[in-house]
A protein has these predicted regions:
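Cation-handling catalytic/transport regions enriched in His/Asp/Glu
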Residues: 180
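Active-site bordering "gate/hinge" segments
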Residues: 1-171, 175-177
Length: 180
């Protein structure tokens, strides 16, 4: 219900604003999505799916002296009961903004780096996009002509389990209509 959603978003923002060095908020938002989709294809598949998705988002501004930094946190769940709590989202957004304070620019150099989970997921999104059939067909992929070539170091592995249920991106069947 709308009132409960507003209360959760306000709680998230309030908890975040109570943290040290958090100067302001770009807002907190709770959104809920519900849809019903019907799929049909030439393989004889006709299926109706009911989907829900719930998101809680908080964006903050941290300030120390004259320096200001922004950061955000969010939670996503298919079931509203599994959504990350307002407290956890607010506190994590505050922590991320606070951690950026005092950051500095480095001179260009070659050195080992460590990516945060958020950064690494963005890199994998780019990789998966480059592997997509449509980009290969349109010849717009930076991995064009990479068939049978390693595109990641041997130390990196990608795991996919299409049979998981109740996970983001899960489907009851693939694009060819093959049921899981």
């Amino acid at each position: 219900d709308a009132k409960k959603s507003i209360d959760i978003a306000m709680e998230c923002e309030q908890i975040a604003l109570e943290q040290p060095e958090i100067d302001n908020s770009d807002g907190a938002e709770l959104s809920s999505f519900e849809a019903e989709s019907i799929y049909a294809n030439s393989n004889g598949l006709i299926a109706k799916l009911h989907n829900t998705k719930h998101t809680l988002f908080c964006s903050l501004i941290a300030k120390r002296n004259d320096e200001m930094q922004t950061a955000y946190e969010y939670g996503i769940a298919l079931d509203a009961n599994n959504l990350t709590s307002a407290t956890k989202v607010g506190l994590e957004a505050a922590k991320l903004a606070q951690e950026k304070l005092g950051s500095r620019h480095l001179n260009p150099q070659k050195c080992p780096i460590i990516f945060t989970p958020r950064q690494s997921s963005g890199l994998f999104s780019q990789l998966l996009g480059a592997l997509s059939g449509s980009r290969q067909y349109k010849k717009t992929s930076f991995l064009l002509d990479s068939l049978d070539k390693d595109v990641l170091p041997k130390t990196v592995s990608v795991y996919e389990d299409p049979l998981q249920v109740k996970t983001l991106g899960a489907r009851a069947f693939d694009q060819d209509g093959v049921l899981k």
